[in-house]
Amino acid sequence: MAQQTFTGRKRVRKFFGHIREVAEMPNLIEVQKASYDQFLMVAEPPGGRDDEGLQAVFRSVFPISDFSNASMLEFVRYEFEPPKYDVDECRQRGMTYAAPLKVTLRLIVFDIDEETGARSVKDIKEQDVYMGDIPLMTMNGTFVVNGTERVIVSQMHRSPGVFFDHDKGKTHSSGKLLFAARVIPYRGSWLDIEFDAKDIVFARIDRRRKIPVTSLMFALGLDGEEILSTFYNKILYKRTKEGWRVPFDASRFRGYSTVNDLIDADTGKVVLEAGKKLTVRAARQLQEKGLKALRLSDSELVGNYLAEDLVNPKTGEIFAEAGDELTGKPIKGDDKEIELFVGATPMKAILEQGYKELPLLDIDHVNVGPYIRNTLSADKNMTREDALFDIYRVMRPGEPPTLDSAQNMFQSLFFDAERYDLSAVGRVKMNMRLDLDAPDTHRTLRKEDILAVIKTLVGLRDGKGEIDDIDHLGNRRVRSVGELMENQYRIGLLRMERAIKERMSSVDIDTVMPQDLINAKPAAAAVREFFGSSQLSQFMDQTNPLSEITHKRRLSALGPGGLTRERAGFEVRDVHPTHYGRICPIETPEGPNIGLINSLATFARVNKYGFVETPYRKVKEGRVTDEVVYLSAMEEGRYAVAQANISLDAKGRFTDDLIVCRAGGTRDVVLIPADQVDYMDVSPKQLVSVAAALIPFLENDDANRALMGSNMQRQAVPLVRAEAPFVGTGMEGVVARDSGAAIAARRTGVIDQIDATRIVIRATEDLDPTKSGVDIYRLMKYQRSNQSTCINQRPLVKVGDKVAKGDIIADGPSTDLGELALGRNVLVAFMPWNGYNFEDSILLSERIVKEDVFTSIHIEEFEVMARDTKLGPEEITRDIPNVSEEALKNLDEAGIVYIGAEVRAGDILVGKITPKGESPMTPEEKLLRAIFGEKASDVRDTSLRVPPGVQGTIVEVRVFNRHGVDKDERALAIEREEIERLAKDRDDEQAILDRNVYGRLADLLDNRQGVAGPKGFKKDTKITRAVLEEYPKSQWWLFASPNDKLMAEIEAMRKQYDESKKGLEQRFLDKVEKLQRGDELPPGVMKMVKVFVAVKRKIQPGDKMAGRHGNKGVVSKIVPIEDMPFLEDGTHADIVLNPLGVPSRMNVGQILETHLGWACAGMGKKIGQTIDAYYQRQDLKPLRETLKKIYGDDETIKSLDDGELIELGRNLSHGVPIATPVFDGAKEADIEEMLKLAGFDASGQSTVYDGRTGDEFDRKVTVGYIYMLKLHHLVDDKIHARSIGPYSLVTQQPLGGKAQFGGQRFGEMEVWALEAYGAAYTLQEMLTVKSDDVAGRTKVYEAIVRGDDTFEAGIPESFNVLVKEMRSLGLNVDLHNSKLGVPPPAEAAE
């Protein structure tokens, strides 16, 4: 399974996975890079850019016209100029890595004819305008802002569109479901349509006061009749002699309860007796028998509603309006008969006017409810004008409406593209939900849309259709960097637009250029604000490569326009079936953010609409193909998807008849026939994130512990010597490559030169004549990460090695041979040990400390600035007043510490003096001044010193000078060193270029007839290599041959060579010029020095360690090697863990890892013995056989030559690395087989002896190798002590916390403890002289200095604060110091 790569041949992982992976895992930081590239579109494609990203922003804001339409500013195109500084320079100088944006604008000035108002073009001017800097993304998907690396986290938010929901019966006490619809645009006003408890439908705009929904429809231009005809069908009741004839429709009459007999209108027969219910089946049978119409009496029309206005055709008088209810009054003296009224008009009066039929609304109160009709009758607005005024009053209370303003306001709410944008996503979602067919370029609402929303909502109330699930991933989408940035830039441009309009109207438009109208500050400020202070722009977590990659793949539901922690309920945080393969169900923080911050699954990607997609293999007629299709959550709902571990035969057919699938909209797990399966997962690990996919035996761990395991891997500190895990999952190489920690070769080539800081590769493929044939890779040496861990890269190649494109040529922090290596493999015994591993404590062997197994390097950065103060400039110097020569021993003549110096707390790093204010002189000073002239010293020492708790070695010093300030010797030395480095790069590249070009030239000229040449060359002699060697290479160009084609080729080559040479020199000069130029420093700063101190942290009691299965603990004791438990062969355990940590936590994965790790080490030992034997006998056959036993027929091992095989054997002798992918890993039988292969007992347990007594323990102990990590919670960063230090201003008590160099809080409970012991004097000290008795603590200090131990406590300052507080409340409290020795009265004692 191992790829044939340069590092893959040096270490081969035995692969336990059974499932062939069809899909390539996408690049892990693609989310970031693709999104931002799409936003910027740096290279303009031929035919112009598409309307998206930055282009779309400019297109939406421009053209800008002035208020009188006499001129117009149009956008033509934009381009980026190259950035001023590259990424490294920005990191060092504390600048933002950004490119200047240049926009071409066209100003058109019109002539307006005063009579006709027609416009004609008078003048057109085009100009390039600078529009601020746009930050660029680095190769690794981060941004460098003010010198620090930041990541823009993608945001999950509710997709624009329409959503239907109900209140789950919570609003009204009866538990009635109140339905509501909400139209959410990408930007603009929200529209809510909702039912109240009385079944009246209301609309709300932007969560304001509600208005009847019919008012909204009036405002849209409908009248009452149109509203009713939109929502209800019309039925004609015809008047006959006997009564009313009504058409019979089975679906309408089902469930109809009869009061009188139902009579067939044609035959007069009774179809159904009175008092019975017409069932669905009976209704259908009647229709089949040919029942056409029924005869109804007046009383059965009561409760129906009129569908149209009834108008007197002669007079135009309205009898009854649409929506009026039919009522009946009993006729006096007659029980049966009633008189029918329509509204207030008697039916008789209507029939007398010649009306033969009555149009009624089809409302049966069962299938169709009268909600809209009731709303209409409850609505006090009757016309469009009233409705518009009403809406205006809701939106702008307190302003008197005019018809014009009300109309404009309503128009701008939903129908104006400037103010309202559904976005393409919103339109697509809306079309899908409401079965509309508007094009996705139509981004505002239409009348049809609003009516369709109301119709669907009323349908829900009538029991048709389903509500939406807002946690479904089809209803949530991701906004990545590009989109967030686009929104931000649009805000900036809109701010700019206002200023431009005003300026266009105020200046003489004929004389100005576009440049004069534009002030790019608002746009630049919006961008700066977004990158600097947005909640989604985060300081990158750079603890190790995994934490970087995870940070870039994070999805947050928080942030502007998202949720807040407090408001987010359970449902939002929960795992949803649609998360499968899209969002990891495991990796999320513990605590208040749980479920709101998620991680993208390994194979997931974000599509152009912002929905998360996951890949599936297509299944055709029961056969699984290798075609991979990406589906979003909405699309997946229609298909049945099988899991990746379903068994297949050789042809890819399912071996079982019934397959376990996820099917239907709810994604329930069901069994379905093989031929009905549509898709199959591509890989078992597609449902988890990168961090979770790095946990072997994840399937055997409890979810809570797996969550902790994936989160703690991100806190692992890079160790001095990284070691890849014996038991991995096969993801390690992918993470190392994609995170950018390890360096991959850009082109195939041969290693030309190498040292610890750079690798030079001579390319042998992809040779582009316009580019150089040399790749120079600069390695990062001892650089500080954001979390102060150490970034250090080490080469893996030797001179002459051949590498292919994409091969790993250098390891970075936490990588080992191109694989992620967060911790170390250590020998663990699971057993209690004298209580030292109680409650998850960890017992360590001294070997771990001695051999620096868990030692890490941390780099602390300190900076000092020399400012220009009112009293004069500060100065960085070695000449500091009142400081001994001993204290200055590490400083050079410029007052800056040497590189390599060992420093400890309190040492001076950079000497600095600050001018002191003039203080009035005493007579003695005046006398001394008169005698000795110049006063002693008017400066004070403000040097940069090492803070408490830091001790280490200086690894780097950087000096920054303001323009025009003379550089000191140290700054010049650093500059010289840097220039030498650049010159070496240039010379090496030049040498390889010369070698390549002159080599090719010699090949071309060899054995050619020479017609001309340099001085001393005889004409018409043959040119051979020997002839060429006689002349310097620069003169070879003078040789000429009669072959014209050859000469043309040589000429082209020479031109190319000259250009490359010139380009090289130019690049070098540019860099040198940048170096020698002054630095851009904050205002008032003359000079700045940064000092980097490398601190070596060995592991010690109090440090936190963890495995990959959520098994975390704190080191409790470090025991001498000889006291640790040991095995029969004398090997001592490195770590002793408590076995009680496993059962209750249910993370059994760690035990399986222990057994498998034990087998790996055992097999490694065997390989080591075989190699030792080889050195004696020179026979490689046993090694090949041993490897075959372990790996089976591995292609890579077969292809190795003897030298490579020995190197591989040596790499494997510590332990054979294996990969057990998640959900598809080694089974119990595999582990037992490996243990037997290694020569161990299949139980995985060994006899162990006590190191202190040498006795055998009573029973066997589980022993094996676990991959342990040292986490970032180091005791050195937390422990803290103080004797004297800063005090709070008001209470005069010591400050708190390590950062403020504060004291320890002696709180209420601690006081109780001392009171309980009766330690009165100790307590008094704690509350007075050790805290806030100002006079007392000074006296104590003096007494201790004198060696005296008598002191007394005074009044604490907080008592005075209390007195002042009481006075401020108007209580005059005085403190009387009575010195009288009179005892208090006796009753006071009681």
Swiss-Prot record:
Identify which top EC class this enzyme belongs to. Answer: transferase
The question of whether Aminoacyl-tRNA synthetase is a record keyword is answered with no
User: Which catalysed reactions does the entry list for this protein?
Assistant: RNA(n) + a ribonucleoside 5'-triphosphate = RNA(n+1) + diphosphate
Gene Ontology biological-process annotations: DNA-templated transcription
Gene3D superfamilies under this entry?
2.40.50.100, 2.40.50.150, 3.90.1100.10, DNA-directed RNA polymerase, beta subunit, external 1 domain, DNA-directed RNA polymerase, subunit 2, domain 6, RNA polymerase alpha subunit dimerisation domain, RNA polymerase Rpb2, domain 2
Q: Which PANTHER family match?
A: DNA-DIRECTED RNA POLYMERASE I SUBUNIT 2 (PTHR20856)
Quaternary context: The RNAP catalytic core consists of 2 alpha, 1 beta, 1 beta' and 1 omega subunit. When a sigma factor is associated with the core the holoenzyme is formed, which can initiate transcription.
Q: What is this protein called?
A: DNA-directed RNA polymerase subunit beta
Which source organism does the UniProt entry give?
Rhodopseudomonas palustris (strain HaA2)
The organism's taxonomy opens as: Bacteria, Pseudomonadati, Pseudomonadota, Alphaproteobacteria, Hyphomicrobiales
